């Protein structure tokens, strides 16, 4: 990789210092190892090229250096980085049983360490400082970096970004209301912390930076609309100054009933003078009507500024909660990706955590690269992406959208790469009982029935609650119908995202020509993994 030089400091600019500050240094490029792919209902072989979308398991410093060495410089239209915050917390992942049995069985079964956010003096800033030049080099000239942080380090990180990206490329600071203060927190000393900051920088503001203004839709009851808007026979409306509208355009708006005259006056059209005015004086207004949703509900669109209080945090959207710490909501990433990128653009998330960025990028038709050093994060992201990709595959074939009615734009799958040996799971699944049936037809199909899986903590709970079966302790099942013993190339995955949803245990996958080795992998709720293989000769 070529050397990366920082831009010269601006005259009179502020440069941040900290204990142990040193110029960024980078490791030599490493070649990651392909460990897994997922392409719904596609038969793949050793000769098949892996999908372009990719998830890296390992230190993102290695991943960023590798991407530059592999020719990705200047490719990413948008980078969303959600690094640790220097919170002083050892973050854990909470695992819950998937069951509709009594509520006491739906509590936390196990808490597992995921990542440490505890730093020695100066180490946190050096950690971020070392990665910023690499992120800058990966950005397209018209691209933008969105760096997510909170009150602890936002002031320091802005200084670092000014130094690495140039103060002239600062675009804005988004204040996102990530939570609403409740309980004892409302009495916090000198007010509770209820917001995060997102620092937005351009690679080259003069390019200019890709930008799509955003609008937000607000629903109002009839009483709320009546208190905020005027009303006529066509409904509720607001007015706006017509500005430099021509005489002909004003006549057209008047014919449509969209001009408003104040003080109870009328709109006068003077053909001789070629002017349109209000009979009782004052300025004319152009009417903009609220959309009626029926049942006394109305919708209004408004522009979005840099205070985002309309996107709830995870605490008020529990349906998205995957149990992974510091998870961000999909609505937040939807707005960011829609504002700074287009369909088909490359998006990078070097701290992907629970996988919100790649999941949203997949739905919005962006191409993506993501990375995380936590194996638990990689497992959570893989499971999430498996569910999204299968839904996108269905949407592409029958034009149905996802659960919220949005059309999934990209049925493409993804590949997983590792820079280090995959960490062995803390607790593995035991014996897996399968029933395999080959069904011949126009396309050969294999029916796979998972009859039982020996999961240690599920077995102990079943002694107390006999109705509890192995499915309650399973997060996902994936099947590779042509396993080569090296890379797990899944063609089908059962990865329910809803907390209480369970895997079905019965699947149909397209079959390659016999003989073939079919592999079934089960991941339990504690991150334990087990794979069993069956040789099918005919």
Segments from the language model and where they lie:
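Conserved proline-anchored active-site loop of SAM-dependent methyltransferases
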Residues: 74-93, 161, 347-361, 370-371, ...
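Conserved acidic E/D residue at the C-terminus of a beta-strand in Rossmann-like folds
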Residues: 59, 371-373
């Amino acid at each position: 990789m070529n050397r990366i030089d920082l831009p010269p400091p601006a005259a009179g600019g502020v440069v941040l210092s900290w204990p142990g500050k040193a110029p960024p240094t980078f490791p030599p490029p490493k070649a990651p190892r392909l460990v897994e792919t997922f392409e719904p209902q596609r038969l793949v072989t050793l000769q098949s090229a892996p999908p372009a979308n990719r998830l890296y398991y390992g230190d993102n410093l290695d991943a960023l250096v590798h991407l530059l060495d592999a020719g990705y410089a200047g490719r990413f239209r948008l980078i969303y980085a959600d690094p640790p915050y220097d919170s002083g917390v050892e973050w854990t992942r909470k695992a819950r049983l998937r069951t509709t049995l009594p509520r006491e069985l739906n509590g936390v079964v196990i808490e597992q360490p995921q990542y440490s956010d505890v730093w020695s003096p100066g180490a946190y800033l050096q950690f971020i400082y070392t990665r910023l030049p690499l992120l800058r080099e990966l950005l397209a000239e018209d691209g933008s970096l969105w760096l997510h942080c909170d009150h602890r380090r936002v002031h320091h990180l802005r200084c670092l970004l000014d130094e690495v990206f140039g103060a002239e490329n600062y675009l804005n600071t988004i204040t996102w209301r990530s939570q609403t203060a409740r309980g004892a927190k409302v009495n916090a000393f000198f007010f509770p912390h209820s917001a995060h900051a997102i620092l937005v920088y351009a690679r080259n503001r003069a390019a200019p930076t890709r930008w799509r203004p955003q609008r937000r839709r607000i629903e109002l009851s009839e009483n709320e609309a009546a208190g905020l808007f005027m009303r006529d026979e066509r409904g509720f409306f607001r007015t706006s100054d017509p500005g430099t509208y021509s005489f002909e355009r004003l006549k057209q708006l008047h014919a449509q009933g969209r001009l408003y005259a104040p003080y109870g006056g009328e709109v006068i059209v003077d053909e001789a003078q070629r002017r349109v005015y209000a009979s009782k004086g004052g300025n004319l207004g152009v009417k903009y009507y609220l959309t009626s949703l029926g049942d006394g509900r109305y919708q209004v669109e408004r522009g979005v500024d840099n205070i985002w209080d309309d996107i709830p945090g995870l605490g008020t959207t529990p349906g998205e909660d995957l149990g992974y710490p510091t998870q961000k909501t999909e609505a937040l990433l939807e707005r960011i990706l829609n504002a700074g990128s287009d369909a088909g653009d490359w998006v990078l998330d070097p701290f992907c955590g629970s996988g919100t960025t790649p999941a949203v990028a997949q739905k919005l038709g962006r191409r993506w690269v993501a990375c995380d050093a936590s194996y638990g994060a990689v497992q959570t992201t893989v499971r999430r992406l498996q569910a999204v990709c299968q839904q996108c595959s269905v949407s592409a074939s029958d034009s149905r959208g996802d659960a919220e009615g949005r059309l999934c734009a990209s049925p493409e799958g993804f590949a997983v790469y590792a820079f280090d040996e995959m960490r062995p799971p803390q607790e593995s699944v035991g014996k897996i009982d399968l029933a395999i049936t080959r069904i011949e037809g126009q396309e050969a199909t294999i029916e796979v029935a998972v009859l039982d899986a020996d999961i240690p903590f599920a077995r102990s709970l079943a002694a107390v609650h006999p109705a509890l079966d192995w499915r309650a302790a399973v997060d996902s099942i994936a099947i590779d119908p042509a396993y080569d013993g090296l890379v797990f190339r899944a063609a089908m995955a059962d990865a329910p995202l809803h907390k209480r949803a369970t895997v079905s245990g019965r699947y149909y996958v397209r079959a390659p020509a016999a003989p073939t080795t079919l592999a079934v992998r089960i991941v339990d709720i504690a991150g334990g993994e087990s794979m069993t293989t069956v040789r099918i000769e005919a």
